[in-house]
Swiss-Prot record:
Component of the large ribosomal subunit. It comes from Xenopus laevis (African clawed frog). The keyword Repeat does not apply. Component of the large ribosomal subunit. The ribosome is a large ribonucleoprotein complex responsible for the synthesis of proteins in the cell. This is Large ribosomal subunit protein uL24.
Length: 33
């Protein structure tokens, strides 16, 4: 769900999540991609 994704992207990502999603503290825009 997008709202869950926003909540997850609200806080700084851990190193694991950074590598997994290839992002830092930016929202993932898979919907746009």
């Amino acid at each position: 769900p997008s709202h869950v994704r926003r909540k997850i992207m609200s806080w700084p990502l851990s190193k694991e999540l950074r590598q997994k999603y290839s992002v830092r503290s930016m929202p993932i825009r898979k919907d746009d991609e």
